Every structure is written in structure tokens, then in C-alpha cells.
């Protein structure tokens, strides 16, 4: 899968702004972007300078305006993106109150997934002691469990809210990146918004830099 964001038709206003998660206001200085399946991307910008905007744009959460987005050469809509995307952070999503086991087992059946629950537990490093806990109440395992649910739901794009470098560094020892690599190897796209490339560049396939360039 190849995703192209075309900003060439944007006239006048060069920025896109949006209220995200009701607490974050983010502005992206629009530019062309291309992403390929099978990769984990770090979306790098200062807080409020576009990394979360682009993440949620790919998640089908933001109106395109004059932007055009193409998947494998086909012009797609916000709803098209929403139907194939999955938020790694469940706390703002409808599935936050679902338990790990029941939600995954139901989705396996609904989507006729060839994997068993045991396969998913192994692939995403899910702790059996937390199988009956609601996703929003998980701590270090929350993103892995959400990723597992998105995977068995057949999603192709996995996006996330802004997190700082220390968050990703702490998650490195929790098997989160092993789970995300499993997703990427299955042909999905993962985007991780962060304020600096200090650590993230060592664990993702590519960084996309979004901070505006200021003339001096």
C-alpha cells in the first residue's frame, strides 16, 4: 500500500489546524508526504507543530480541506481512511471498555481471521494475567493490546497521539516495538508522533520531519 498526501492544490492558507482529543490544538504546515506499507514512521515535530495532526489525518479524524490523499493511486476520502485505520491509544475510542480477551476473540470470529487468540497473545506479547481487563485500564500493555485488536479487525494504518521521547524510550523495554514490527511485517503502516528524533530514529524505519522552516 502506498499513501500519497498531495498539498499542491492548497491555496492561500498554508497551514492546517485542528482540535484533537478535545485538549490538543495542532497546526501542520502542509506539504506533500508519502508513506509505504511495511514501515514504522516517526512523525517528528515540536508539540503542536503538526506531528499529531498528520497522525490523526491518516486516521480519518480530520477533514482534508484542499488536500488530496491517494492510496495506490486512488483518491480517497476521510471516511475511507477511517475505515482502515486504528488508534493505538484506546482511551478516546469506543473500544476502550472492551476486555482484551473478549474483544479479540469476537473480532477474530467477525473478521474471519485465521489467527487464534493464542496466536495473537504470542505475536503481541499479551500477559495472560491481563486478558480480562478493559483496554483503557491497561498500563504498559495498552498499546500492544490495542494493536492486537486492530490487527484482527483487519486495519491497515495504525496511528497514535503525540508522545514525548521518554514515553517511547520506556516502551522500548516492554515489547511494544516488537509488536509494532510484527504489524509492519504484515504490511501495515504505523505512525508515531513525537517531539524529537533523539531516540525514535533508532527504532523506526523512517522519520518524517514536520517542523516549519523559518527564514532568518
Question: Which residues does each PLM region occupy?
Answer:
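Conserved ABC nucleotide-binding domain
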Residues: 120-139, 154
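ABC ATPase nucleotide-binding domain signature region
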Residues: 36-111
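GG-anchored amphipathic helix commonly corresponding to the ABC/SMC/Rad50 NBD signature/C-loop
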Residues: 139-162
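A short, flexible loop at the N-terminus of ABC-type nucleotide-binding domains that lies
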Residues: 1-32, 36-37, 63
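Glycine-rich phosphate-binding loops of nucleotide-dependent enzymes
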Residues: 44-45, 55, 63, 149-155, ...
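Conserved switch/coupling elements of ABC/ABC-like ATPase nucleotide-binding domains
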Residues: 208-216
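ABC ATPase nucleotide-binding domain helical subdomain, centered on the C-loop/LSGGQ "ABC signature"
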Residues: 105-124
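Conserved catalytic loops of ABC-family nucleotide-binding domains
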Residues: 38, 153-158, 165-201, 206
Amino acid at each position: 500500500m502506498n499513501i500519497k498526501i498531495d498539498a499542491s492544490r492548497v491555496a492561500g492558507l498554508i497551514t492546517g489546524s485542528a482540535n484533537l482529543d478535545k485538549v490538543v490544538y495542532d497546526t501542520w504546515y502542509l506539504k506533500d508526504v508519502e508513506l509505504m506499507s511495511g514501515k514504522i514512521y516517526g512523525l517528528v515535530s515540536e508539540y503542536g507543530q503538526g506531528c499529531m495532526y498528520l497522525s490523526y489525518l491518516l486516521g480519518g479524524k480530520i477533514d482534508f480541506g484542499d488536500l488530496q490523499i491517494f492510496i495506490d493511486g486512488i483518491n480517497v476520502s476521510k471516511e475511507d481512511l477511517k475505515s482502515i485505520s486504528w488508534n493505538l491509544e484506546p482511551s478516546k475510542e469506543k473500544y476502550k471498555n472492551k476486555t482484551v480477551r473478549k474483544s479479540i476473540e469476537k473480532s477474530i470470529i467477525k473478521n474471519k481471521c485465521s489467527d487464534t487468540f493464542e496466536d495473537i497473545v504470542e505475536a503481541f506479547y499479551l500477559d495472560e494475567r491481563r486478558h480480562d481487563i478493559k483496554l483503557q485500564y491497561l498500563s504498559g500493555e495498552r498499546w500492544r493490546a490495542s494493536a492486537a485488536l486492530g490487527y484482527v479487525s483487519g486495519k491497515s494504518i495504525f496511528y497514535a497521539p503525540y508522545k514525548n521521547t521518554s514515553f517511547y524510550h520506556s516502551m522500548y523495554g516492554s515489547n511494544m516495538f516488537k509488536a509494532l514490527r510484527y504489524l509492519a511485517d504484515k504490511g501495515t503502516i504505523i505512525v508515531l508522533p513525537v517531539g524529537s528524533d533523539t531516540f525514535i530514529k533508532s527504532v523506526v524505519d523512517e522519520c518524517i520531519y514536520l517542523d516549519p522552516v523559518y527564514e532568518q
